[in-house]
């Protein structure tokens, strides 16, 4: 059997379900695939197919995640669902499954619960740009006023974490009833799909973003100059483009005088490609792995930032013991380790393996960074944690 070709006619959007345990995230995921496959084509996935999430490794961390896809008339969606709370935390922090938007599932019978709050906070910290709400189990609540109260509570909670609570689409429904074939509740799933189409804007493609290439290797070619190699993370570069070398040392501006891939000369290098970039007037020793090549003015070097971090358990190959304030591990950004010190939130004395925590990090060298950049925490080359830059301080 030949593999069917993935037709990319429609824009592709990454979404996922978040919310408190047992509020119906997986049931909703199954309901969406079931209802939309009937209406628009695609593959229906049963609850147990989604619930038995396969293990994946992201940055050395084991995460259970289910991936499903579905279509609306205008878009193709890739949707992630995680079985356990810890999987959500790891998924969001490592960026294993980047989300352009999230569907927050809240059971109308319970209202917002501790993990509801925690997932909204995580979404804010790791830069999930849009949240929609599916108010689930509405068939079990007879009182319309009660539904209204729960809705208000959810809106207030979203606003607390800087999401536009008042303007957030909230769809009232029942995932289970929709799965069982109840037409009125299936219509609510279609309504949710329409809301996804309308509320989550089409994300900017990597190729349209400003050029950035993390430098992996540097060598000099006699008579031609210095070449840096790496994979273009975003944007594109053309011969004679002006570029900045950012991070670790003072920022330097230079010009790209040639681009090559597999020993062939190219006119341009694009997002996703491994290329060598020839730089004008730069000596081999002026540049090192861990710096980035970037479009001038598009990214700055920083040493201090607030981070959201997950610390690996012993079983995941992490530390066996807690760490305390003044802990000095290495922070691995893109292609290199930089030593840094940490400050813990007030009232937190120690961090245990398996915890997720907010911390303030100060690096000994500046690194090119923006909010949302992922990193690993390492001790002597062994990964002990994963993190994301929540907010650059300086």
Curated annotation (Swiss-Prot):
It holds the Pfam family GTP_EFTU_D2. It comes from Hamiltonella defensa subsp. Acyrthosiphon pisum (strain 5AT). It catalyses: GTP + H2O = GDP + phosphate + H(+). Keywords: Cytoplasm, Elongation factor, GTP-binding, Hydrolase, Magnesium, Metal-binding, Nucleotide-binding, Protein biosynthesis. Residues 60-64 are annotated as: G2. Signal peptide: none annotated. This is Elongation factor Tu. NCBIfam families: EF-Tu, PRK00049.1, PRK12735.1, PRK12736.1, small_GTP. SUPFAM superfamilies: EF-Tu/eEF-1alpha/eIF2-gamma C-terminal domain, P-loop containing nucleoside triphosphate hydrolases, Translation proteins. Belongs to the TRAFAC class translation factor GTPase superfamily. Classic translation factor GTPase family. EF-Tu/EF-1A subfamily. Gene3D superfamilies: P-loop containing nucleotide triphosphate hydrolases, Translation factors.
């Amino acid at each position: 059997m030949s593999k069917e070709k993935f037709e990319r006619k429609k824009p592709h959007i990454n979404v996922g379900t978040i919310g408190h345990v047992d509020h119906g995230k997986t049931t909703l995921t199954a309901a969406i695939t079931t209802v939309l496959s009937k209406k628009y084509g695609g593959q229906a996935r049963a609850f147990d197919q989604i619930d038995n999430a396969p293990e994946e490794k992201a940055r050395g961390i084991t995460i259970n995640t289910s991936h499903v896809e579905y279509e609306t008339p205008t878009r193709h969606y890739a949707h992630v669902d995680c079985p356990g709370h810890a999987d959500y935390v790891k998924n969001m922090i490592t960026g294993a499954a980047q989300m352009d938007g999230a569907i927050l599932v809240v059971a109308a019978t319970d209202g917002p619960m501790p993990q509801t709050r925690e997932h909204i906070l995580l979404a804010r910290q790791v830069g999930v740009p849009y949240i929609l709400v599916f108010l689930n189990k509405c068939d079990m609540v007879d009182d319309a006023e009660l539904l209204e109260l729960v809705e208000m509570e959810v809106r207030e909670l979203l606003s607390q974490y800087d999401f536009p609570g008042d303007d957030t689409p909230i769809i009232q429904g029942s995932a289970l009833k929709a799965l069982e074939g109840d037409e009125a509740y299936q219509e609510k799933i279609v309504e949710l799909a329409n809301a996804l189409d309308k509320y989550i804007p089409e994300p900017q493609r990597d190729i349209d973003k400003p050029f950035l290439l993390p430098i992996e290797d540097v060598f000099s070619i006699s008579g031609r100059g210095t070449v840096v190699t790496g994979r273009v993370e975003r944007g594109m570069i053309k011969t004679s483009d002006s570029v900045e070398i950012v991070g670790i040392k003072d920022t330097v501006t230079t010009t790209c005088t040639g681009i090559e891939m597999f020993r062939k000369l190219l006119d341009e290098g694009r997002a996703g490609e491994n290329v060598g970039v020839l730089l004008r007037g730069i000596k081999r020793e002026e540049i090192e792995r861990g710096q980035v090549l970037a479009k001038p003015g598009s990214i700055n070097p920083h040493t201090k930032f607030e981070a959201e971090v997950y610390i690996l358990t012993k079983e995941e190959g992490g530390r066996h013991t807690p760490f305390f304030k003044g802990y000095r591990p290495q922070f691995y950004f893109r292609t290199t380790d930089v030593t840094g010190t940490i400050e813990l939130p007030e009232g937190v004395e120690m961090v245990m393996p398996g915890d997720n925590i907010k911390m303030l990090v100060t690096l000994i060298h500046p690194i090119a960074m923006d909010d949302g950049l992922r990193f690993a925490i390492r001790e002597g080359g062994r990964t002990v944690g994963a993190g994301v830059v929540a907010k650059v301080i300086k």
